[in-house]
Amino acid sequence: MKRSKINAIIKDFEKMLNEYKFALPPFLSWTPEEWKTKGHEYDEIRDNALGWDVTDYGEGNFETKGLSLITIRNGNVHNKKYTKTYAEKIMMLYPGQVSPNHFHWNKMEDIINRGGGDIIFRLWNANRENEGELLDTDVEICSDGRRYFVKAGEEITLKPGESLSLYPYYYHEFYIPKDSKPVLIGEVSMCNDDNTDNRFYEPLGRYPTVEEDEPAYRLLCTEYPRAV
């Protein structure tokens, strides 16, 4: 992805967060130059990949297959120094965009429609013996205190304010209808590592390759300099 594209997406994201009065921690407004002055007291941000994250899953087609997100808080499954057992993210999805089909081996999460248009989900049970197989079995849904079953791959609509619980080995994809508005999406989950706990149905990259065509407006969570 071109840096100019990433910069524009982050600015869009900031505008949407302001529109819905979702305030962010101070570190999310630091410039690249400010990051160069930060010492080890901010290692939790670096070590746990808190911050901005814009991805096209390595396919170069962000408008249809992409996601913008911010990890606001997280623990670290690989480092006992960080004892948080929970994580929080806020995401933005544009109309026509899909977050591609995947499951988590360990993470349980709630996805919340925080405002904008509708989110459309499709879920399948994964075959634990053959993880690349989508089972044709009914999927148990837990949504805002209600439990019920749907057919595999059946569409589930989340309107603003509604949420959906996703359990390990639940294949899930979600998208925003083309005639909708951008959607602000919350995630409350167990502590997790996106590098090791995403099983995509079709092999995909997690982070983009960045083409530097202009200076960075905000650093991505994979780009922080070493502590001074």
Predicted regions and their residues:
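Conserved metal-binding segment of the jelly-roll/cupin
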Residues: 94, 152-179, 185-190
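Glycine- and acidic-residue-biased ligand/ion/polar-headgroup-sensing regions
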Residues: 94-95, 107-109, 113-129, 133-137
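Short, conserved secondary-structure segments in the cores of folded domains
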Residues: 89, 109-110, 154, 162
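Double-stranded beta-helix
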Residues: 2-3, 128-148, 175-228
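A short, N-terminal "cap"/entry segment at the start of jelly-roll beta-barrel domains
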Residues: 1-87, 216-219, 223
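A short beta-strand motif that forms part of the nucleic acid-binding face
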Residues: 105, 115, 125-127, 170, ...
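A short beta-loop-beta micro-motif enriched in histidine and acidic residues
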Residues: 78-87, 98-110, 114-115
